[in-house]
A protein has these predicted regions:
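Extracytoplasmic/periplasmic
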Residues: 1, 298-374
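Extracytoplasmic
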Residues: 2-111, 346, 405-496
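Interfacial segments of transmembrane alpha-helices in multi-pass membrane proteins
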Residues: 87-139, 206-210, 491-537
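Hydrophobic transmembrane alpha-helices
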Residues: 101-105, 121-122, 138-159, 202, ...
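Transmembrane alpha-helices and their membrane-interface boundaries in multi-pass membrane transporters
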Residues: 134, 151-161, 187-206, 211-252, ...
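Helix-loop junctions and hydrophobic alpha-helical segments within the transmembrane domains
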Residues: 168-195, 569-573
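Signature of alpha-helical transmembrane segments and their immediate interfacial
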Residues: 236, 250-298, 307, 311
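C-terminal transmembrane helical bundles of large multi-pass transporters
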Residues: 428-433, 438-573
């Protein structure tokens, strides 16, 4: 008996066009359940707990019924990706520390020196997390890179300090004199290296993107903090440790390393034409690659194509039109403009028919669907009556859709009442309505073309003197966010070069040396961009930092070479 009732309800459900391609797809026998988050829980840690609990229940249901379950939606995708970023950040951090420890051990053959260096970067990492908390920032795709970045920049600081300490100790055989020489020689070098590296990342704070601003502030502050940690921690610790033994300074006389450096030196001075020629070829090759770079980002393009999150998103795109929210607001510019006549409804219906023809979109949901559903109900559920009411029919249906007095009819404005449902798509003055529609993740390159097509349709259907149409939603904000980040990259590189050039002029007081220092920093950026173009890596929020990292490392090496040159010039005349 229960099965027959259920079958009857299912048949009745499928006679309601309102739900077709919205909650079920008859062609693929797919049924969709929509879950909404309470606003108070959407941006809290409770979201992860709720989603995990939901997944457990659905997995049990899937096992018991042998039915395939697909989960997607913007809150779900963001939650899963955020959790993965936290886990991957931990592995990335541990991996960078482990590799750094192995490198230091192989290089210096000293456990105390290795532990001291790891302590410096560990303090830097703790400071980076503390800075994020103090500034009220959360772990995002970009800020998750800051702790490993601290390791990458902090370890060279330690290596240069230790290398100078070992070199000075070998010359003087006096620990105190070696520490003094280390601080006097490497202090200014490390200071300017960290200043320029901090500038390279801090300039992101000058952009309009909130995501890049957060990253710029935290990374800039913590890269400068690394200098003070290194300067205040390494010399005192070295003064308490035993002087380096012969084993610890043996790397200074490594014949293989010396042979390699001598070869590089010979090529630099004896084969200048070859060096410049190869560099020119690389630059030309890179410029061609730069022209191939695509500016395109997708919501889940950083996930493997075989990942369940990616597969489920594509399933929803095939069966439900996607999960990316798109909101269209239609304003009649007059109070009660939506109900004065059926003309606005006819225009909206024409526009929604256009939306149904767009392959990027799912089924639209708005005031028109509610009114057509109400008309069907008025005619005792006849599916052929699911259409926009005429003027006469609207006069009969309208009283049933008007907000009732909550005192005389407490059920009238409950969340499940028709009035409450319609109120979600119409404002209190009845002058504006919204259409909600899900769309596919078509990427930031195709989205402007799609929006231009939408704009042309709205101008053709709606008279701009009587209507104002606005297209918004997460799909549009995603595009704007991606564009802000990519534009911010160009701005940040410009400001980075300008500020770094000022630092170079202050440090060397020489325009030729300034030009000499900037050229080696432009070439790595060109090669980096060229490689991205040839390999097919798109310019997107998750890859823009590659340029800052390349600039930071190139500047670091350039300054160390030039400061060393400036220090040795008076001594060697």
């Amino acid at each position: 008996q229960n099965d027959s009732l259920l079958l009857a309800d299912a048949q009745k459900f499928e006679t309601l066009p309102f739900y077709k391609n919205l909650l079920y797809n008859k062609d693929s026998n797919a049924y969709i359940m929509a879950v909404s988050f309470i606003p108070d829980s959407i941006n809290t840690g409770a979201r992860t707990r709720i989603i995990r609990l939901l997944e457990e229940k659905l997995n049990v249901f899937s096992k018991n019924t042998n039915l395939a379950i697909h989960l997607s939606g913007l809150p779900y995708i963001r939650t899963i990706i955020a959790d993965r970023i936290k886990k991957e950040m931990l592995w990335f951090l541990v991996g960078s520390l482990l590799l750094s420890a192995i490198t230091l051990l192989l290089f210096f053959r000293s456990i105390p020196a290795t532990l001291m260096s790891l302590a410096v970067v560990a303090m830097g990492v703790i400071w980076s997390f503390g800075t994020m908390v103090l500034m009220g920032q959360k772990i995002t795709l970009l800020t998750a890179l800051i702790p490993p970045l601290v390791v990458v920049i902090g370890i060279p600081n330690c290596i240069y300090f230790l290398n100078k300490y070992h070199t000075a100790y070998k010359e003087t055989n006096d620990r105190s004199a070696a520490i003094i020489q280390m601080v006097s020689k490497m202090g200014i070098v490390t200071l300017f290296c960290n200043i320029t590296a901090a500038i390279g990342f801090f300039v992101f704070a000058l952009t309009k993107s909130p995501l890049l601003k957060e990253f710029g502030w935290v990374s800039g502050i913590n890269i400068m903090a690394l200098f003070f940690i290194s300067l205040f921690f390494i010399p005192p610790v070295l003064s308490y440790l035993k002087p380096p033994s012969q084993k610890h300074v043996k790397y200074l006389e490594n014949k293989y390393l010396t042979h390699l450096l001598v070869k590089i030196e010979r090529w630099t001075f004896n084969h200048t034409k070859w060096v410049f020629g190869i560099t020119l070829i690389l630059v030309v090759f890179s410029i061609v690659g730069v022209l191939k770079i695509k500016k395109e980002a997708f919501i889940v393009d950083d996930l493997p194509k075989k990942d369940k999150l990616y597969i489920d998103l594509k399933w929803f795109e095939q069966n439900a039109g996607g999960v990316m929210p798109l909101e269209i607001v239609i304003d009649t510019k007059k109070k009660n403009g939506l109900i004065r006549s059926t003309k606005p409804l006819d225009h909206i219906e024409t526009f929604q028919q256009f939306l149904l023809t767009q392959p990027e979109l799912g089924k639209p949901l708005g005031l028109i669907e509610g009114i057509k559903f109400a008309k069907q109900a008025f005619y005792d559920g006849d599916s052929s009556s699911y259409s926009v009411p005429s003027g006469t029919e609207m006069a009969f249906i309208a009283p049933y859709l008007k907000p009732a007095d909550g005192k005389t009819n407490p059920q009238a404005n409950t969340p499940k009442s028709p009035t409450a449902l319609l109120n979600k798509f119409i404002d209190t003055e009845k002058r504006a309505t919204r259409i909600s529609v899900n769309m596919k993740d078509i990427g930031s390159a195709q989205l402007p073309i799609f929006l231009k097509r939408m704009d042309s349709a709205t101008q053709a259907i709606f008279d701009t003197t009587n209507y104002h149409v606005q297209i918004t939603g997460s799909s549009v904000t995603f595009l704007e966010g991606s564009n802000f980040i990519i534009k911010g990259l160009g701005e940040s590189i410009f400001w980075a070069f300008l500020l770094i050039a000022i630092c170079m002029l202050f440090l060397f007081r020489s325009f030729p040396i300034l030009m000499c220092s900037l050229v080696p920093n432009v070439v790595p950026l060109l090669i980096t961009a060229g490689c991205m173009g040839w390999i097919g890596v798109s310019l997107k929020p998750s890859t823009v930092l590659v340029f800052s990292v390349a600039l930071g490392i190139a500047i670091d090496v350039t300054i160390r070479f030039l400061v060393n040159y400036k220090q040795e010039l008076p001594r060697l005349n």
